[in-house]
Amino acid sequence: MKKYPYTTIDEDKIGGFNYGNRGDQFYTQEKNIVSELSNYDLKGKIIYCNCDRPTVSNFYKFFKNNFNDLGLKGLYASYYDDNPLLAYFNGSQETYKRLSSGRFQDNGEVMKLCDIVITNPPFSDSMATELIRMAKKYGKHVIIVGPNTIASQKEMFDMIKNNQLNMGYTTINRFNTPSGEKKTAPTSWWTTIETNKPFFKTGVKYNPSNYQKLDNFDAIDIVRFDKDLPDDYYGYMAVSPRFLRVLNRNQFDIITKIRPVIN
């Protein structure tokens, strides 16, 4: 897929108007948006950025500035505010409509109009999972930034296991805050779109003396999957949730989630 160049927007400017606790407000840098979204075919899609103030959101600006190159059909954006507006861009004209509420939970009718929700919701498990759940209810896809701990929640894990939710292609852990500071956070891209990642290889051969067995499951413990996962082992392996970032569904199956015990 074509790699889209940065627009003239400063990558250090804030990228989304989120709501929730002020400590949850981490704004996405444009370079991270470009890096991840270049992996998806968005041609003919209507995008909804539902936690994004159009005047400052790097998500909205990226889609608006690359509307024709991406082949988009439409672009919506809404945000939390006492007097919110819904922005719509069709490639040539931008219009605004007053909303009764900026909370994405109250704007299901707008979500029904889109194909994919792409945003950075407030950094809390409940917000991210609620957004995924809502999009699933309306039959819409998501590409969002969310906490790594999403994978530990039963409902979300079941979606991961059934290939209904995947970790994205690129890493993302540096953000800007309302005060202008740069912060790091344990986050990932999450999407309900099926990913197509290359087979994962470390070049490591299995040696039983190098791996401990779990006491509570018939699996070997993989401490650092990027360095220790053996290419020639075909039994069960216990890996951290971060392994989802390199998961190829044709290479590995997700079986279950456990809290490993090794005595």
PLM segments and residue spans:
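Class I S-adenosyl-L-methionine-dependent methyltransferase catalytic core
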Residues: 1-263
